[in-house]
């Protein structure tokens, strides 16, 4: 049980996909201008990364490995993620049309989010079991969501701040992301996993 908790904390804080592995930077920068959009994108990404990790592990273990067609891993995983994203897109459209409108093109682009594909490929490369893959996917998604929501809250405050003209927009956003990354480096000694 402790191993699973350490895995979750490790991927959530210490090995965060956005701030440490630099995966998922496109939605991180693109959707984080408003807090409500970041929360919605975080929930959708959490759903996709968790289910994608589960289904990809099952497909790898019960189809790709037994049939010795490992060269189709990436293609199979992208297909699984596309199906999960389409399901989540239909769900968000039905439950919250306003959130669906706010997320716009970023919702279907979850399929090509490198953090989503990265968690699936890292699960296979790290030889995780089913439960570990699920925890790794959920922890990675929770870390992605946490960082995106924190970043969106900071960006909303920066939008009303008096920032010198050369630093407005993407410049201050990248500086802020760098400072967040430095802050998360403080968690490095927390988990030795």
Curated annotation (Swiss-Prot):
One GO cellular component term: plasma membrane
Coiled coil: none
GO biological process, one term: electron transport chain
UniProt keyword Membrane present: yes
Superkingdom, natural source: Bacteria
Topology with respect to the bilayer: Multi-pass membrane protein
Major location category of this protein: membrane
UniProt record similarity statement: Belongs to the NqrDE/RnfAE family.
HAMAP family in the cross-refs: RsxA_RnfA
Name listed for the protein in its UniProt record: Ion-translocating oxidoreductase complex subunit A
Species per Swiss-Prot/TrEMBL record: Pectobacterium atrosepticum (strain SCRI 1043 / ATCC BAA-672) (Erwinia carotovora subsp. atroseptica)
Gene name for this UniProt entry: rnfA
